[in-house]
A protein has these predicted regions:
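Short loop/turn motifs enriched for small/polar and acidic residues
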Residues: 1, 105, 146-150
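Extracytoplasmic beta-strand/coil segments of soluble accessory domains associated
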Residues: 1-19
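Outer-membrane beta-barrel translocator/receptor signature
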Residues: 10-11, 23, 32-35, 41, ...
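Outer-membrane beta-barrel domain signature, strongest for Gram-negative TonB-dependent receptors
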Residues: 117, 122-170
């Protein structure tokens, strides 16, 4: 559901790395470097600690690994779309693993605002995530630190309200 009220909870909860995303408008970013997605139906107040009557979607980023690895992908598409994404992972010390993932996406808009001479609904975003995982030897304890950064300079779409007799003409 789409709910813009600042005082109401949405009926389906969205969680990213066990952090509740309170409004669907806050979830306006691309998914990248995903490890798994879990979907749970029905009320989940006890399991997830939130009043989500319709269920929950939990999205987990890929975790740091104890072996070195990585990937790098680049693509080009219509409307001059450029997408570069990748990740690097591996051990930093005997008890600490790290992971860095990123995505850069740029695309021209689908429409043109002729009054202001700009593209509309363009995409210009940068996303980065860094993780440190502490796994001490001879212990069941573990800790995971995740830092996310998103910069979205996209201009979205433009709408103009019409008034008068022509407003309902179709």
């Amino acid at each position: 559901t789409r709910l813009d009220s600042p005082t109401a909870d949405q009926s389906i909860g969205i969680f990213t790395d066990d952090v509740y995303v309170g409004r669907s408008g806050l979830f306006n970013f691309d998914l990248y470097d995903i490890g798994r997605v879990e979907v749970v139906r029905g009320p989940q107040g006890v399991l997830l600690g939130r009043n989500v009557a319709g269920g929950a979607i939990s999205i987990y980023s890929a975790r740091p690994e104890s072996t070195y690895g990585g990937s790098l992908n680049a693509s080009y598409g219509n409307y001059n779309e450029k997408l570069v994404k990748g990740h690097f992972t591996g051990p930093i010390s005997d008890s600490v693993n790290g992971r860095f993932a990123f995505q850069v996406r740029n695309r021209d808009g689908f429409a043109r605002d002729i009054a202001h001479d700009i593209d509309l609904d363009n995409v210009d975003s940068v996303q980065m995530r860094g993780q440190l995982q502490y796994l001490p030897s001879n212990s069941d304890f573990s800790a995971l630190l995740i830092a996310d950064f998103t910069k979205d300079s996209s201009n979205g779409f433009h709408s103009v309200a019409l008034d008068g007799p022509a407003a309902g003409a179709g």
